[in-house]
């Protein structure tokens, strides 16, 4: 029990000391400096005025902010139990690597004479672009699919914005985004290791992806703040500014259906959801139908589950009473898609929890996947049984019996 408490406290403190996390102390200090500098340049505000706006008690100790702090504490405990049971990106990367071996009947070696830094640059850029595009797709789905909105709504009920608002998420949304990161990283790692081998490296600064480091150090934490900073009409067509994300959090639903991107604005431009920042910030943040219990922690965790069940149930009952057999409305379609997404997430979670052993068939040389196997075993504690050789399929069937997917 004592070890669990120490581990929990370590997880709570880690985001402030880890450059891979948004609220790393260095990024928070950088955000203050950016806010002071740009506020003076763009609007002539003094350092004292900007600091007063940044650290106003009415923002940092509001009901909304206090709920954020509670959610951080609760979600951390929840995710400590869930994350080790999710499918590993190393396992998925290994599966993809082996699958590509079969597709290509061997492993090509692309650009054998290319400098290592070129391969590292291409890999880092590809991973960043894929990750950012996936964030846009998932974020837009959370808004467009009513079932998923039941959970994402928790984030948008924030009426005051602080850097900790980024963690104001329901655990179901947390699992969805965790799986998104796992799949995207596994895709990039598997493909690049297949084509470029051990030349695949990530360009980092202080251990963080170089692109995300620059994003965070240049004021990413101001996205969830009351400091209005616009990049101008030209730059905002390429990068999402803090002001654009604050527009996304506006209480006006027309604003909330825009600027779904995380870093790059190109996805919103392609999807028709880009909105440039205007001269004035939104009048208020949150959602229009906020209730007195909006910032109650029990309500934050329970209400989305109730609403999700209702979201699934109501279209079905309406269909029986009113709709012809062949008529499905758009809301039902979206809820069905959302249900499938949730089913996949829970299925992956359930499979990971139930799997004490992982059985892998490989007709390739052991050294090709052994590093992935060892890393996966060290990270998850899962025992891995690997069958090598051409007759491995028969051995696999014999070992796994009737439960074998083969």
Where are each of the predicted segments found?
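Short, strongly hydrophobic alpha-helical membrane anchors
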Residues: 1-19
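Membrane-embedded catalytic scaffold of the fatty acid hydroxylase/desaturase
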Residues: 74-88, 92, 96-97, 105, ...
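A membrane-cytosol interface segment of integral membrane proteins
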Residues: 206, 281-322
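Bacterial N-terminal signal peptides that target proteins for export
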Residues: 326-340
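Early extracytoplasmic/lumenal segment of secretory-pathway proteins
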Residues: 355-406
């Amino acid at each position: 029990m004592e070890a669990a408490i120490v581990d929990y406290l370590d997880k709570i403190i880690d985001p402030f000391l880890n450059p891979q996390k948004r609220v790393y102390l260095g990024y928070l200090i950088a955000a203050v400096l950016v806010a002071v500098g740009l506020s003076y340049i763009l609007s002539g505000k003094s350092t004292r005025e900007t600091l007063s706006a940044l650290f106003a008690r009415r923002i940092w100790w509001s009901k909304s902010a206090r709920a954020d702090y509670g959610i951080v504490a609760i979600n951390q405990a929840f995710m400590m139990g869930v994350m080790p049971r999710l499918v590993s990106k190393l396992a998925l990367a290994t599966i993809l690597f082996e699958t590509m071996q079969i597709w290509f009947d061997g492993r090509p070696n692309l650009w054998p004479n290319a400098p290592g830094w070129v391969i590292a640059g291409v890999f880092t850029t590809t991973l960043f672009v894929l990750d950012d595009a996936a964030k846009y797709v998932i974020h837009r789905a959370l808004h467009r699919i009513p079932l998923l909105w039941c959970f994402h709504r928790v984030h948008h009920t924030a009426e005051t914005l602080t850097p900790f608002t980024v963690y104001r998420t329901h655990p179901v949304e947390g699992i969805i985004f965790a799986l998104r990161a796992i799949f995207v990283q596994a895709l990039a790692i598997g493909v690049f290791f297949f084509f470029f081998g051990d030349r695949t490296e990530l360009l980092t600064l202080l251990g963080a992806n170089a692109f995300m480091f620059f994003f965070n150090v240049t004021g990413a934490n101001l996205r969830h703040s009351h400091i209005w900073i616009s990049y101008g009409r030209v730059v905002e067509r390429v990068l999402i500014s803090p002001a654009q994300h604050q527009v996304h959090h506006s209480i006006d639903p027309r604003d909330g259906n825009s600027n779904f991107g995380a870093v790059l604005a190109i996805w919103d431009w392609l999807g028709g959801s880009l909105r440039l920042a205007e001269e004035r910030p939104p009048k208020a943040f949150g959602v229009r139908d906020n209730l007195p219990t909006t910032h109650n922690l029990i309500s934050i965790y329970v209400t989305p589950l109730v609403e999700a069940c209702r979201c699934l149930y109501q279209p079905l009952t309406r269909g029986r009473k009113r709709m012809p057999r062949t008529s499905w409305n758009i809301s039902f379609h979206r809820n069905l898609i959302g249900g499938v997404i949730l089913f996949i997430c829970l299925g992956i979670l359930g499979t990971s929890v139930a799997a004490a052993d992982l059985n892998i068939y490989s007709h390739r040389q052991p050294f090709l996947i052994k590093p992935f196997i060892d890393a996966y075993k060290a990270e998850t504690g899962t025992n891995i049984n690997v069958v090598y050789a051409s007759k491995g399929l028969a051995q696999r069937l014999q070992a796994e019996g009737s439960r074998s997917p083969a």
